[in-house]
């Protein structure tokens, strides 16, 4: 009996020892695995957040558009022909006079910077502007570059009087309706009448043809809408008008001169 009891006690001790062994092993595994999980959690928590990098938005810089707006000019050129004053030009009153024998070798388009012209008029006359410039220089006008005239030129001229002028003599006043059509580019009925009599009549059969050619040449140009120095003006014109790139231009105070041959191709202007 004692022997049996001893055997049972031994078996119990062995079972307890085995149970204790597996219990300790399980705790060890549990303890050793916990830090790994926590580290993983910590690693996930501590991972740096990479926010997407956005390149700074590129804002294109646009250079000021200095081109004259035709629509503004047209709006400013509304004038009732019924209020035209006496705009006829009398040849004998012209201080240069007539030259009907001079040849026509080429043409010069004369453009005028209207704000500069009007400043001179105001300096000279104050508030009492002559009628011929009241429309162009009056309040609320938006004229920039305008056409002074299209002048037939003598290549051998040594003075203004050597160029063709008044080739058909003293002509009658043109119809008001015809002049009104071109006030948008040449703001003055007397200006238009005078340019036709003095210059246009030397190379064109009619005033309509003359003014239409002026308008055609003018509309083919891109023009700045602010005052520029001589060099800046030449540079701007050549940059924005490829047909002028290699041409010699001329300028005088508030005027720009572009020359054309008899086939209406751009050519070099003579230096004088």
From Swiss-Prot:
Entry keyword set: Endonuclease, Hydrolase, Nuclease, Signal
Active-site residues annotated for this sequence: 148, 195, 199
InterPro entries hit by this protein: RNase_T2-like, RNase_T2-like_sf, RNase_T2_His_AS_1, RNase_T2_His_AS_2
SUPFAM superfamilies in the record: Ribonuclease Rh-like (SSF55895)
Leader peptide range in chain numbering: 1-23
GO biological process annotation, one example: RNA catabolic process
Hydrolase recorded as keyword: yes
MF-aspect GO terms: ribonuclease T2 activity; RNA binding
Family note: Belongs to the RNase T2 family.
PANTHER family noted in UniProt: RIBONUCLEASE T2
Protein name: Probable ribonuclease HI_0526
Organism, as annotated: Haemophilus influenzae (strain ATCC 51907 / DSM 11121 / KW20 / Rd)
């Amino acid at each position: 009996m004692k022997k049996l009891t001893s055997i049972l006690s031994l078996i119990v001790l062995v079972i307890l020892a085995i149970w204790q062994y597996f219990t300790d092993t399980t705790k060890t595994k549990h303890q050793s695995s916990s830090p790994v999980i926590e580290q993983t959690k910590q690693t996930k928590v501590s991972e740096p957040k990479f926010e997407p990098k956005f390149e700074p938005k590129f804002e294109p810089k646009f250079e000021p558009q200095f081109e004259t707006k035709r629509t503004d000019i047209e709006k400013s050129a509304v004038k009732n022909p019924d209020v035209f004053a006496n705009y006829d030009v009398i040849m004998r009153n012209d201080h240069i006079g007539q030259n009907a024998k001079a040849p026509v070798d080429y043409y010069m388009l004369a453009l005028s910077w209207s704000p500069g012209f009007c400043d001179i008029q105001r300096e000279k006359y104050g508030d009492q502007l002559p009628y011929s410039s009241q429309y162009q220089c009056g309040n609320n006008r938006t004229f920039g570059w305008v056409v002074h005239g299209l002048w037939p030129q003598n290549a051998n001229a040594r003075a203004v009087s050597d160029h063709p002028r008044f080739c058909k003599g003293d002509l009658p006043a043109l119809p008001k309706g015809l002049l009104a059509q071109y006030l948008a580019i040449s703001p003055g009925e007397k200006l238009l009448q005078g340019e036709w009599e003095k210059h246009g009549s030397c190379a064109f059969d009619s005033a309509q043809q003359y003014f239409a050619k002026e308008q055609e040449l003018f509309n083919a140009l891109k023009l700045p809408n602010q005052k520029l120095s001589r060099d800046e003006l030449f540079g701007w014109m050549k940059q924005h008008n490829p047909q002028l790139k290699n041409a010699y231009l001329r300028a005088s105070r508030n005027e720009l001169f572009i020359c054309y041959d008899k086939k209406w191709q751009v050519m070099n202007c003579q230096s004088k």
